Every structure is written in structure tokens, then in C-alpha cells.
């Protein structure tokens, strides 16, 4: 038995020790961390909670990084340190990290002492660099990634990859791309790379610059949108060519950089084979792909715009995962051990819980670019009510400020003569309003002139410098006095990247800091300003912020994101679903897209091919955390597309509203338990290889498997039903299916494949026109037999923060499959307006009952008055 020394942290006492680590250095154990003094620098192991360890590698005297992510002040967890001649191990209940004294490699293990992650030998890298003539470091860490690992995350990207093992990505904030340096692995860990600037994931150092060849195709004029409003642009495609030599055959990761801040087209051909072909009026400047190449020379063609300067980067796909940041104060990352829920719950414990979203935000959000007048907005809200189409919120997009200048924090009275009466009428219809507010302010506006005089702009731009606390306070003051007074319900913070990665080569924070240092965190500063202002100045209204970009920790500011200004085609639909799932694993739980696409065809109202696309976008979006439609220069209301389309959309609106008791209970699980509503299959089936390979299927809460239709003309499609001992039940027809199989599903335009896990209990509410509508109609409690199951129902007022004071209630539904009994627990807690009596129709799902959207045959009707009940069925 090896001789070991053991050190246990004792509360309130700092134990220090120094031992020889072979030929390296010594270690000191402090109250909050263990510091290893290596020849190359200081390696700190910092226990954060029982399943998370932070690793920092720095140089002596390095200034600590400003803490923007880990804001929760938690006690130092109990941990112990053991040491022998070969290693030093820091251990907690849920994770341990072992330092190898010979290789200086860190190995991470879970609660069962199973290796979940390991650094590569020689994979820790830190070198002196500079940014804007100021000293900084370039840092890099390489990890071992076995071939059977699946990795997800880094945020919302447009490359179409859900499993990003081996894929190269460049993490910057631009329209349609939300960069979050967090990954989740099928091996049972999450990793957050603690850096606020540009980060390269699996960076490719080999590259070729392509040279212009010729123009191809005719010039076309298109309508586009940007920070200066609607613009018509003339575009023509140009070809660029090059060749590359690869030394060996195998898989290669490619990163195409178009050489501008935004792209309009990705078109990459290798040896005549099309690799990428994507068009949109807005695209991130980089995209990625993994291809198989044989050893030798390969001809490359890229098509783009005349001013593009395309560069193709490439690297062999190998058994490693790499993070690299070019601007850093130290190498800094955190490892979380556990399954997907445990990882994200741990992350939120450290970075802040996601507040409860308002109940009404989980209904239907209707948006278009744009309503031009107060009368037009009210007319369309009335039409929703007259047509009995459920809606909770209507959205006023940009340019309501009119003659006062961009984002002047006021309505142009020529078109919006009385915003107060507009809000009153909307609220009388039980319709909420979201309004677009930007971080950019016209420097010639009244507010802009003040901002310029006070030095509150980021120099050389029209973006407010939210890194300057005085500038942020100024912004909120004008926000409060100009807009908050009307009782507006939700706030759309557009273009918060800021648009086009606009901090590069700029100075921020009173010109004291290079923008590159905080290049990816601007959206979090904006959301923080708005959320904290709302909590202070509108404390009785539950906040909802809608923003186009995000970063780690932003969930604590009641911020939801969407996928930006995307197109409408099938490929774009597929990429949005993948992008949303990529964000879900990073801990930011609220997301959606522009259902139907932001950029739509000119004949959208009569084009039946587009109608099919629109329906499939809306069907998928019914099962997103937020359900929303939007479109550029479009009247997006359902009735514009004809009776057939309107009827199908109405059915899915009904389904969304019937699911609200289920969705709102998951809203509580997100806030209280660190859960996730829209769930890539790795979160529930990490051992199922076929599940891990499904790009478009996902779980909606713990019970519902969603398989969106993402291709044209589909009448029948294959759906994978993950391994599940009790199997699955078809939502539409009640047919049971085994788990771990592919099944063929008949798909017509009315249906998107939905399966419910056997043993699930779905609480379905009555049909409603808005989420907070009071009705005496009963709930339907659907029981999917085949296994025991349970569901915890949560209720509160839905519109305020009284839940933070304990004013909410819960009750549990438990199904015993063998004796066919449903037990309803005592109700726990209470809140103002709580129904003392609830009517339930209980249904055991079979092919003859409990199928589809609407209520059907009932097994038993009961009255629940808050006391425990056992119902035999």
C-alpha cells in the first residue's frame, strides 16, 4: 500500500502544507483552494460545490479576472486532499480531481470514481501576448476526447452540427449566432471555459487564403435589415479558389471565414463536391464542417460577395477537445460532474437561478416587422380575439420612435398618438405588449446628444457603453422615464451582440479597456441593466427580457433569446432546431425562433410550398420554451395565409394552451431545480448511441418526445424511440411502442410526430384564449400506462414575484401501474387567487381514449379540494 498523506478542510481553519512534487514544485492547501506551484506557473484547484471544480493556471502576480459568471456567494464545500509520491487528489462527494506529479495532467472522476475527463499531456498552454498594445495572455487547454464521446453546446450556431466533437468553431457574438463557452458530454461532465473574449473551440491552425476567380450569376437587389433600418442592397456572387494538400487520409474539421463581419452566403466545394450551401441576408462570418479527405491535393472553391476575403482553416479530427482564447488574464475553466440535469443545476447554483417566466409569456407571442401605427396594432389584436385564436402577447417592432431618431425612448405621436390608451385597450383584451428597445441610440436624438456629451457611447459607434456603470444608469433612467410609465409588459432588447461583433478594435469602460477583453459579454451587461432596473422600478410585475444574444450567467436576468434574422427554407429550419438544442445544454433555458422564418418569400400568402414550411415551423415551435412567429416586411397573422393554414395553426395554438399546466410546472422546475424544458436527447438518454445521433428530435419536459418534420412533402418518416423499459405511446393515436427502435410514422400536414413516455402523467388544461383566463372547465389528467409514474404540479399567481416569498402551491400526481390507482397528494402551500376546488377528468390513454389535442372519453371525473385522494381506475 502506498504511503499517503491526507488533509481535510476544517471550517474556519486554513491548513497549509508544502510537499515536493517530484521535480516540479510544491502545493499549498488553503481554505478555498489548493495551489500547486509549477515551474510554468501557479495551478489552482478550487472546489465550487459538491460536483464542480474550477481550475486556474496563472503567472505569479497576475491580476484576478473580474467575476461576471459566478455571482452566487456559496460556502466553501467540504473537501479533502490526499497525496502520495505519484499524485495529489482533491475529493468531494460528486467529483474528484487528481494531479499527476509526473505529467502534471489533471484527471476528473465522478462520484463512482469513473474517469469523465482528462487533460492531455502537455496540453496546458499560456504565453504572453498583447491586445491594442496592452499586455495579455493567449491560453489553451487540450483534453482527451475518446472516439465514443458525444459533445454538445457552445451555444446557438448555424453550421447544423449538434454533436460538435472534433468540430472547429469560433465563438463570437453576431446576428444568428450566440456564443457560450460551455459544453456537455455524454461521458457525464460539463465544462465552462471562463473567458469573456473570442474563444476558438478545436482551433485549426492550418489555412489557405482563397483568391478571386470571377463573378458568377447576375446582380440582384434585395431588401435587408440592420442597425440603420430597412435597406435595399445589390449583390452579386463571386468565386474564389485555392488548393490544399493534406498529409493523410481521414476526417478533417474545416472552418470557413468569409473575411467580413457578416456573411451573406456559405458555398464551399471540394473537388467538385458541395460541402456547404447556405444563403441568407445575414450569416455569421464563419461556418464549420467535418469532411473525409484522402491524402494529397484537393481543389477548393468558395462563392461569396465581391469584398469577401475567404480563408479556409483545417485540422485533422483527433481524440482531443481544445479551448483557446487569444485574450486572457489566466487559463480558467470549470468542470461539472453528473448527468445533464445535475451539470446544469450545479452551474445555476453557482451562476444564479433563472427566475420564473410570467405565465403569459408561455402562451403565444405574435410578432411581425412591423406594425406601423397604434391603430394597426390594436386592429390586429382585436382580430385575434374575434377569430378565437389564442394569443397572450403582441409585439411592437422597431421604428415606433419615428421622427425622434433611432431608439429615442419615445413614441412618435403622429403614428402612436396615445400609448397609454393603447396599453389600456390591449390589457382590456387580455393582450400583453412587448416592445423593441435597442442598445444603439441615434446620436442626434435628444437622448443621444446627452449620451454623447457625457461620453456614454463606445467610441466610434452608436452603442451605449454598458461597461461604464454611469452610462448603464443613464440608459435605464431614460428607459424608465420614456417607456416604463406606460405599463409595457416585456422588453425586446435587439442586436445586443452588439451587432456585427462590434467591440473588436474599440475601447470600452470609459475607454480604459480593450473591447476584445469583454468581446462576448455585452449582451449580459444589457440584460443586467434592464432586469435590475425593472426589479427596482417595476417590482410588482414579473420581468421578461427578450434578447438576440447571450452569455453564461445571463439566465439570472430573466432573459430569453431567439435565433435571429434567419431565412425560411427547410435547411434553415433544421439548423435552427439544432442551434436551439446547442444552447439548451449551456444552461440558458429560454429560447425560440422566428417561426416561418424572418426573411420570407414575396408570394408567401399564396405560395403553397411556403405554407407547408410555415406550418412545420409553427408545429416545431409549439414545443419550444417560447412560441413565437415573426417575419420581415410581412403581415404574419395566421388568417393571411388562407383558411387551411389558419385552421392548422389554430390547432397547435390550442395544443400549446392545453399544455400550459405541464409547461408552467416545468417553468418552476427550471427556476427551483435547475431543470431544462427543451432537452436534447443526451440529457435523458446518454447511454443510447442512436438517441445521441438524432439531430432534430428532443424531449419537451420529462415526458414528451418531439420529432419535428423538417423536409418537404413528407407523408411517412422514421422516428427513433429511445431506450426506455416501459416504452412509448403515440400522442395522436394511443398506440404503444417499444423503446430502442426506429418506427415509421404516418405524417400528414396536421400532425408532427409526438410520443409520450409510458408511465407519464400529463396535466392538460382547458382550451383558453389567453394563459391567465379564468375558466370553470376541468383539467384533463392523462395517464400513459405501462409503468409507475409521477408528476408534480406547480401553481402561483403567474404575474409577479410573490413566489419568492413562498406564495405558491404544489401537489403530486402518482400512478401505480400494477393496481391502476392514481394518488393525488395534499396540496402544499397557497397563494392569492388559488382555486380551492379543482375539477379533474382522469383518462387512461388507449387507442380509444386520451388521444390528440382535445378532450375525449373520460375514465373518471373527480373534485380535488387540496386533500390527498386515491382514485381506482
Residue ranges and their predicted role:
Residues 12-23:
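Bacterial N-terminal signal peptides
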Residues 45, 55, 90-94, 240, ...:
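Short, well-ordered beta-strand segments enriched in hydrophobic/aromatic residues
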Residues 65-80, 267-287, 454-457, 730-749, ...:
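Solvent-exposed beta-strand/loop surfaces of large extracellular or lumenal domains
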Amino acid at each position: 500500500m502506498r504511503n499517503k498523506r491526507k488533509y481535510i478542510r476544517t471550517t474556519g481553519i486554513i491548513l497549509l502544507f508544502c510537499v515536493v512534487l517530484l521535480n516540479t514544485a510544491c502545493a499549498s492547501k488553503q481554505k478555498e483552494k489548493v495551489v500547486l506551484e509549477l515551474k510554468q506557473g501557479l495551478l489552482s484547484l478550487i472546489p465550487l460545490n459538491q460536483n464542480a471544480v474550477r481550475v486556474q493556471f496563472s503567472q505569479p502576480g497576475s491580476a484576478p479576472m473580474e467575476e461576471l459568471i459566478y455571482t452566487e456567494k456559496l460556502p466553501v464545500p467540504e473537501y479533502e486532499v490526499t497525496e502520495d509520491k505519484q499524485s495529489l487528489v482533491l475529493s468531494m462527494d460528486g467529483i474528484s480531481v487528481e494531479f499527476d506529479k509526473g505529467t502534471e495532467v489533471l484527471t476528473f472522476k465522478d462520484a463512482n470514481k469513473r474517469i469523465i475527463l482528462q487533460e492531455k499531456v502537455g496540453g496546458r498552454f499560456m504565453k504572453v501576448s498583447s491586445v491594442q498594445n496592452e499586455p495579455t495572455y493567449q491560453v489553451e487547454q487540450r483534453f482527451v476526447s475518446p472516439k465514443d464521446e458525444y459533445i454538445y453546446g457552445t451555444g446557438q450556431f448555424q453550421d447544423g452540427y449538434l454533436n460538435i466533437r472534433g468540430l472547429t468553431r469560433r465563438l463570437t457574438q453576431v446576428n444568428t449566432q450566440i456564443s457560450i463557452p460551455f459544453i456537455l458530454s455524454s461521458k457525464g461532465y460539463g465544462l465552462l471555459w471562463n473567458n469573456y473574449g473570442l474563444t476558438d473551440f478545436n482551433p485549426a491552425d492550418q489555412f489557405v487564403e482563397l483568391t478571386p476567380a470571377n463573378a458568377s450569376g447576375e446582380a440582384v437587389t434585395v431588401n435587408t435589415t440592420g442597425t440603420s433600418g430597412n435597406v435595399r442592397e445589390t449583390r452579386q456572387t463571386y468565386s474564389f479558389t485555392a488548393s490544399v494538400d493534406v498529409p493523410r487520409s481521414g476526417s478533417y474539421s474545416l472552418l470557413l471565414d468569409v473575411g467580413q463581419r457578416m456573411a451573406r452566403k456559405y458555398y464551399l466545394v471540394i473537388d467538385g463536391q458541395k460541402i456547404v450551401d447556405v444563403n441568407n441576408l445575414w450569416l455569421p462570418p464563419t461556418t464549420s464542417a467535418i469532411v473525409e479527405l484522402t491524402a494529397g491535393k484537393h481543389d477548393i472553391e468558395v462563392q461569396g460577395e465581391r469584398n469577401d476575403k475567404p480563408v479556409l482553416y483545417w485540422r485533422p479530427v483527433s481524440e482531443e477537445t481544445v479551448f483557446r482564447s487569444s485574450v486572457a488574464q489566466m487559463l480558467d475553466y470549470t468542470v461539472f460532474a453528473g448527468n445533464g440535469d445535475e451539470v446544469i443545476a450545479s452551474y445555476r447554483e453557482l451562476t444564479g437561478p433563472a427566475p420564473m417566466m410570467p405565465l403569459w409569456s408561455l402562451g403565444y407571442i405574435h410578432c411581425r416587422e412591423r406594425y406601423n401605427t397604434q391603430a394597426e396594432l390594436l386592429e390586429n389584436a382585436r382580430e385575434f380575439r374575434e377569430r378565437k385564436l389564442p394569443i397572450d402577447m403582441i409585439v411592437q417592432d422597431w421604428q415606433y420612435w419615428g421622427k425622434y431618431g433611432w431608439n429615442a425612448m419615445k413614441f412618435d405621436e403622429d403614428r402612436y398618438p396615445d400609448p397609454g390608451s393603447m396599453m389600456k385597450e390591449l390589457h382590456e383584451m387580455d393582450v400583453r405588449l412587448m416592445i423593441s428597445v435597442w442598445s444603439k441610440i441615434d446620436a442626434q436624438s435628444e437622448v443621444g446628444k446627452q449620451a454623447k456629451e457625457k461620453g456614454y457611447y463606445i467610441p466610434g459607434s452608436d452603442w451605449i457603453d454598458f461597461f461604464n456603470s454611469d452610462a448603464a444608469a443613464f440608459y435605464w433612467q431614460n428607459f424608465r422615464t420614456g417607456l416604463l410609465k406606460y405599463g409595457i409588459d416585456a422588453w425586446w432588447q435587439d442586436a445586443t451582440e452588439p451587432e456585427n461583433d462590434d467591440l473588436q478594435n474599440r475601447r470600452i469602460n470609459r475607454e480604459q479597456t480593450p473591447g476584445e477583453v469583454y468581446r462576448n459579454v455585452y449582451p449580459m451587461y444589457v440584460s443586467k441593466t434592464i432586469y435590475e432596473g425593472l426589479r427596482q422600478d417595476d417590482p410588482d410585475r414579473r420581468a421578461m427580457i427578450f434578447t438576440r444574444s447571450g452569455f453564461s450567467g445571463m439566465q439570472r436576468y430573466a432573459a430569453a433569446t431567439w435565433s435571429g434574422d434567419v431565412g425560411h427554407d427547410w435547411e434553415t429550419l433544421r439548423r435552427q432546431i439544432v442551434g436551439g438544442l446547442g444552447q439548451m445544454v449551456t444552461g440558458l433555458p429560454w429560447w425560440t425562433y422566428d417561426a416561418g422564418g424572418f426573411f420570407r418569400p414575396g408570394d408567401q400568402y399564396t405560395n403553397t410550398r411556403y405554407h407547408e414550411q410555415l406550418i412545420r415551423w409553427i408545429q416545431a415551435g409549439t414545443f419550444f420554451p417560447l412560441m413565437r412567429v415573426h417575419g420581415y416586411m410581412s403581415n404574419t397573422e395566421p388568417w393571411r395565409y388562407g383558411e387551411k393554414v389558419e385552421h392548422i395553426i389554430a390547432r397547435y395554438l390550442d395544443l400549446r394552451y392545453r399544455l400550459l399546466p405541464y409547461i408552467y410546472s416545468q417553468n418552476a422546475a427550471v427556476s427551483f431545480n435547475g431543470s431544462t424544458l427543451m432537452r436534447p436527447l443526451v440529457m435523458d438518454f446518454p447511454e443510447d448511441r442512436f438517441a445521441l445521433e438524432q439531430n432534430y428530435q428532443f424531449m419537451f419536459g420529462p415526458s414528451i418526445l418531439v420529432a419535428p418534420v423538417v423536409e418537404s412533402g413528407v407523408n411517412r418518416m422514421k422516428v427513433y424511440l429511445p431506450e426506455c423499459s416501459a416504452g412509448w405511446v403515440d400522442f395522436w393515436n394511443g398506440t404503444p411502442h417499444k423503446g430502442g427502435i426506429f418506427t415509421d410514422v404516418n405524417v400528414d400536414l396536421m400532425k408532427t410526430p409526438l410520443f409520450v413516455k409510458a408511465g407519464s402523467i400529463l396535466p392538460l388544461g382547458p382550451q383558453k384564449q389567453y394563459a391567465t383566463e379564468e375558466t370553470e372547465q376541468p383539467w384533463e389528467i392523462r395517464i400513459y400506462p405501462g409503468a409507475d409514474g409521477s408528476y408534480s404540479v406547480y401553481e402561483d399567481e403567474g404575474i409577479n414575484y410573490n413566489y419568492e416569498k413562498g406564495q405558491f402551491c404544489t401537489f403530486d400526481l402518482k400512478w401505480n401501474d400494477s393496481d391502476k390507482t392514481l394518488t393525488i397528494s395534499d396540496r402544499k402551500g397557497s397563494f392569492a387567487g388559488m382555486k380551492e376546488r379543482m375539477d379533474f377528468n382522469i383518462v387512461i390513454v388507449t387507442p380509444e381514449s386520451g388521444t390528440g389535442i382535445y378532450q375525449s372519453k373520460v375514465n373518471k371525473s373527480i373534485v380535488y379540494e387540496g386533500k390527498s385522494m386515491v382514485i381506482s381506475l
